[in-house]
Amino acid sequence: MRSDVKFIVVGGVAAYAHGSPRLTVDLDVVYERSNENIERLVRALAPLDPYLRGAPPGLPFHWDPQTITRGLNFTLVTSLGSLDLLGEITGGGSCDDLMPHCVVVKLHGFDCLCLDLDWLIKVKRAAGRPKDFEAIAELEAIKEERERSDS
């Protein structure tokens, strides 16, 4: 199914796409916040029954464009797994801010926009969590190896 939702893969899946062996349990994406894109996003994810991750069962949550427009970042559980929908990220900003710092990667047979290696390191450093610092060391090693093989 092609949805034409505008988003950028960041986080652990982006690190994996760049060669990190570290496993992740969720998909983090920065989505573009235009009304049209939010409507496409809601339509595309509706069949996956998105619900707020960690919320008590039965807590009212309406998966609709108004909910997404009123919020910014959503940690969701879907029928396919965990998904973090991010309107912006620390150290990187919005989808439009990040767009110049993307590369196209193949993920499960699909071409996806993914944060480039330099910017992935930058935003992980800005996030400042212990798990990000561990990932930064791996990503910097990957970057050094690429630079050696390019020269």
What role is predicted for each listed range?
Residues M1-S151:
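Compositionally biased terminal segments of proteins
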